[in-house]
Amino acid sequence: MELEGVSAGGASLKDLVEFLAKSLGNHPEEVSVTEVETEEGSLIQLKVAQSDLGRIIGRQGRTAKAIRALLSACAARMKKRAILEILE
């Protein structure tokens, strides 16, 4: 899998969330992702354009849940824990 020139083996959790958010939204230039290390693991904060918020969250939160599932699976392979926070 290729994430904008970064091989999957070297891609970070931040890169994964950024790739998914830019692919789903209509305004990829307004996607902002930050990663903060906490005691519990990596906290990934995602900020998107207000008009893209519904697309990122999805009906009844299904899209956000799927992104979180992918993030958790990738983090587990890295023996880490990751939490996704979607900011308004």
Predicted regions span which residues?
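An amphipathic, aromatic/His-enriched active-site/gating alpha helix that lines ligand/cofactor pockets
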Residues: 63
